[in-house]
């Protein structure tokens, strides 16, 4: 099984749509979690009905800048447990009966709302009874080296993120490739790049996968 998570920052853009189709064609994910789609269900269906996923949950955000899409193929036995504008939680059952939990997570982007993200993550843990992996854009980073900017890292926010992962028994899964997943696209000294997207999982999940 392959999992794909992408903050697409608006799927109404034709270039983004082409990029999504290309990624899906090349990576062949079984489950796909998209954030900041900026589309409701009708808009998503009109533009992306030909994507190779037979099942979907589309969550429209009251703010036009948000929105989630959680897509999966029939080949995976997946049951959605609950969802909000910031997450989708599902239970996956493998062919051998092994059960694990998958969360697509989108953290609140504003600094004053970070605590909402961590409360939500702790709340979701209460539904999990076994192996658990969380993928998405947490809108937070775990260490100072994950931010490249003229501005100082927010060490209190780093510590809060670490604490909630420890509390939920989740560990970072690491990455391969370019170290930053977001940029403010400003020139020169005003440019900021941060590693905001990641996967985290508990030991029960990493022991299996």
Language model feature labels by segment:
Residues 1-209:
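A shared catalytic/ligand-binding motif for oxyanion handling
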């Amino acid at each position: 099984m392959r999992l794909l998570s992408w903050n697409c920052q608006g799927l109404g853009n034709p270039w983004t749509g082409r990029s999504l189709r290309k990624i899906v064609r090349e990576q062949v994910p079984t489950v796909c979690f998209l954030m900041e789609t900026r589309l409701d269900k009708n808009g998503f269906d009109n533009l992306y009905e030909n994507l190779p996923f037979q099942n979907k949950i589309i969550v429209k955000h009251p703010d036009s800048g948000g929105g989630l899409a959680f897509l999966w193929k029939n080949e995976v036995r997946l049951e959605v447990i609950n969802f909000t504008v910031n997450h989708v939680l599902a239970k996956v059952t493998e062919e051998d009966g092994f059960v694990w939990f998958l969360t697509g997570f989108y953290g609140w982007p504003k600094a004053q709302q970070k605590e909402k993200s961590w409360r939500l993550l702790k709340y979701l843990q209460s539904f999990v009874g076994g192996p658990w992996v969380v993928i998405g854009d947490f809108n937070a980073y775990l260490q100072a080296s994950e931010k490249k900017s003229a501005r100082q890292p927010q060490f209190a926010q780093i510590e809060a993120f670490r604490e909630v992962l420890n509390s939920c028994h989740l560990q970072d899964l690491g990455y391969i490739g370019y170290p930053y997943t977001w940029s403010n696209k400003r020139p020169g000294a005003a440019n900021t790049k941060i590693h905001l997207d990641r996967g985290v999982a508990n030991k029960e999940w990493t022991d299996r996968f």
